[in-house]
Amino acid sequence: AMCETARAMLVGDNLVGRVIARPFLGSNGAYTRTENRRDYAVEPVAETILDRFAQRGLQTVSIGKIEDIFCHRNVGLADHTKNNHDGIEATLKYLQGDEGSFIFTNLVDFDMLYGHRNDVEGYAKALEYFDARLPELIAAMREGDLMILTADHGCDPTYPGTDHTREYIPILALGPAWKGGAPLGTRTTFADIAATAVEYLTGEIWHNGTSFLN
C-alpha cells in the first residue's frame, strides 16, 4: 500500500521511473527478502515492441516481472513467476504449448538474490542451475524458433557496493534452423535486440537499433 501511494504521488515534476516494493521477513539484523516483489513503473512514453506485436496480432507471453516493468501494457498472457526455477518451468510450458508468438522471460534471482547481495557462491550456483536447465529449453524449441539470451545490466557480486555494474551484456542467439558460431560483434545499443525480434516476427524495421538477424 505504501508503494502504491508513493507511485500515485511521484508524477509530474516529481516523476520517478519506478517504485519497487521489496518485502522482507525477519527481525532486526536478520531480515530476509521475500519473493513477493512488485514493480510500480511508469507507462512507456513511446511504442514498445510489445505494442507492435499486439498491433500485428502476435501473442506475447510475459514471464516474471515483465508485466510490471511494462506497466501491464500489451504484455499479453502474464505469468508472474517469483524465482528462476518457476520462470524456467513456465518458459518450458509455453515453449511446448501454442499460446505465444513471443515469450519474454525475466529470471530475477541473479539480480535480486545474488548480485545485489554480493553473494558470489549463490550467483555461481544459480548460473550452474540455469546451465543445467538450458538443454531442456533448447530441446523444446521448434523449427524456426529463435532464442535470445541476454541481460538488462551488469550486477557483479564481486564488485564493492550493491548497485548495478557496468559490464557489457552478453547476447547469445540460437535456434534449430540457425547456423551457430557467427559472431555478433560489439553492439552499439541494447535496442539491437528489440530490432532483431521485430524483424524476425514481423519482417519490419524497428525505429531503434539495428537487427543482427542476418
Where are these regions (language model features)?
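Feature captures the catalytic ectodomains and active-site-proximal regions of enzymes
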Residues: 1-214
